[in-house]
């Protein structure tokens, strides 16, 4: 983003990383009919917990911490699925201003699903083309469903138990979007304010 540049509309930048137990890679490639091998080290990271049979949440935390330090990123709000971060909640809370364990029920997520859907429709969701294939597969393989109580949920297009669609990256994107949504509602510091503060600190014009 160029200092002082004006943009006609906001954009939500999405970057996703998928995690998979190392020993399940071959079976996932065969079962999903998707060549995950092509994305190792970029869109996909392998976990070696329990000898490569389980997801290593501490490895995920370390990745989040490392990119924060490498790129000097300031985490304002982190939103997470409680089930997926059990054991590292306090660590995540320590590296951001606001840490939210997001209830994953349709009632709790419905308003955010509607809001994220509108951002997609308005063309406000941006990501690096050719570098988010796993994310794209999740988006094109999912559908927004309204249940009998009127609440929305994100579901696979196919509800068969043996289908090869994984929508986890989109579920994670929704949690990330909630953080952005809440930050905007709170009117926290924006990018222009942060840039101005940085310029003042270092004597810029």
Regions found by a protein language model. Give the residues of each.
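A polyampholytic, Gly/Pro-enriched intrinsically disordered region
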Residues: 118-139
């Amino acid at each position: 983003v160029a200092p002082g540049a004006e943009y006609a509309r906001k954009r939500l930048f999405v970057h996703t990383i998928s995690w998979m137990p190392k020993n399940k890679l071959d079976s996932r490639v065969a079962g999903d009919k998707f060549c995950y091998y092509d994305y190792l080290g970029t869109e996909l990271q392998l976990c070696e917990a329990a000898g490569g049979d389980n997801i290593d949440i501490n490895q995920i935390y370390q990745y989040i911490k490392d990119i924060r330090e490498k790129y000097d990123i300031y985490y304002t709000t982190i939103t997470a699925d409680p089930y997926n971060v059990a054991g590292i909640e306090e660590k995540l809370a320590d590296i951001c201003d606001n840490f939210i364990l997001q209830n994953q029920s349709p009632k709790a997520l419905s308003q955010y699903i509607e809001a994220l859907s509108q951002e997609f429709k308005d063309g406000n969701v941006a990501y690096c083309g050719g570098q988010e294939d796993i994310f794209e597969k999740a988006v094109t393989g999912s559908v927004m469903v309204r249940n009998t109580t009127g609440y929305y949920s994100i579901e696979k297009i196919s509800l068969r138990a043996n289908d090869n669609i994984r929508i986890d990256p989109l579920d994670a994107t929704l949690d990330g979007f909630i953080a952005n949504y809440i930050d905007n509602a709170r009117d926290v510091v924006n990018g222009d304010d942060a840039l101005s503060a940085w310029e003042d600190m270092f004597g810029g014009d």
